[in-house]
Amino acid sequence: MLYIMPNAGVIPIVRFINNAKRDLDVNVYYLSDKPILNAVRYAIKRGVDVKIMIDGKPYRMSIRKEKREIKRTGAHFEIDKMFDRKYVFDHAKYMLDNHEALIGTANFDWSAFHKNREYEYTTYNKNIISSLKNIFNSDYSGVKFNGHINHNLVVSPGATQKILSMIDQPGSIDIETEELGYYRPILSALAKKGSAVKIIVPSSISNYDKKIIRFLEKYRVKIRLMPARTVYIHAKTIVGRQKAFIGSENFTYTSLNKNREVGIIIYNDQLINKLKNQFNNDWARCR
């Protein structure tokens, strides 16, 4: 199942939590949304064993209030110490129970579900759930993960090659991303693909990324800016003819090689078409 925000709102997240029966693991960069916290609280009252793990120092944020509110739900709570270093983050956005997983682009805050373009994907694939469970348990316990990663998952550190394979797939690709950044392998792949690439970024993109845009435009990459008053592009997606990517990864060196990030590769034609249609609608609203 694929959900598109802000259209879908917070309901899919709350429904996922409400459907949990025995356990629920949540790993998200930032969590402050009241309906989600309330759903967690009710899940614990039903007897669900809830574990929540967040980043300890989201960029330019103090999270003392957020930590206090999470603890008040009664959930088991940890800061991800495996990625608690300078300029390194637990930037993942996923949750799972014993039979379903949700992977997406949204932080769990009000803006994600009311103002942002975000994508959330749910799966019942047992192998994906098993991989995510092992990753979560390692990070939650503060132990380096060295296990098997399902081939459909895109997990950082070490996600560069899978993102390059998304860019290099035959045919045109459509990208929505909050930022670009100077990471030579990614920029070279985009430049090489040239006019077969369309990219949507928010109009508030940094001056540094504006330089990256000018570089890519020299290679005929098509780039448009989405006005923030329309919708804020926080999504991280690559959509091609054969497969699509949704995840927490920005296309920067740190995101792909240092952070904890989680994404998913989708091969379902119906969902790929849904993503393409949304991209085309967004493209038409850009400038």
Language-model features, listed with the residues they occupy:
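Class I S-adenosylmethionine-dependent transferase superfamily signal
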Residues: 40, 187-190
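HKD-type phospholipase D/PLD-like phosphodiesterase module
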Residues: 1-21, 27-168, 195-269, 276
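Long, repeat-rich segments with strong aromatic
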Residues: 177-179, 184-188
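Charge-patterned, long linear interaction tracts outside catalytic cores
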Residues: 278-287
